[in-house]
Amino acid sequence: MSRNHKKAIIAFLIVFAVALCYLRVVPETALSERAIVVGLGIDKTEKGYAVSCEIINPKSQSGGGQGESDGFALISGTGKTLDAAIGEISQKTGLKVSLSQCNLIVLGNMFLTEQTFPSVNYLVQTYAVPELAIIAVAENSAAELLKTKPVMTTLSALQMQQTLHSATDDASIISTNVKDFFKGYLSR
């Protein structure tokens, strides 16, 4: 191989590496194509899971939601797995579900079993749920809790977050986040 061929190959590899790093080979999803979840409710059913999402930006929703106004809605989906239930919500909205802004996870009372940790771990690793997201447990159904009409804000998830943040000094109300949940679970 001649010296010019080696230089050409090296130059090509450098250009290729720069193109890979800086030209964004991975397609980017526009914000208008995302269903931004601010509150997530998970219930265990006989057939699998029921997931309720309080979503901002459900514009291309084709049905199945409740309370849609001012760019937000509560949309539910069911499936044998969490992924299937979230996929149903994505199909109903026509948008890609994004949990990276979800700061509240409500677990239904029937959900508190040994599967709690793997399910929360799956959400954090697959959908990038923030580690400071609050985890709350509903007395009955997580969907019922998210359906409640808040007094101070338009989104019940935001009202619950504010209430739980302000109640952390009260010893009768236990509030935890994803990070503390993992720390407590893994330290057993």
Language-model features: locations:
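Membrane-proximal alpha-helical signals and transmembrane carboxylates
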Residues: 1-188
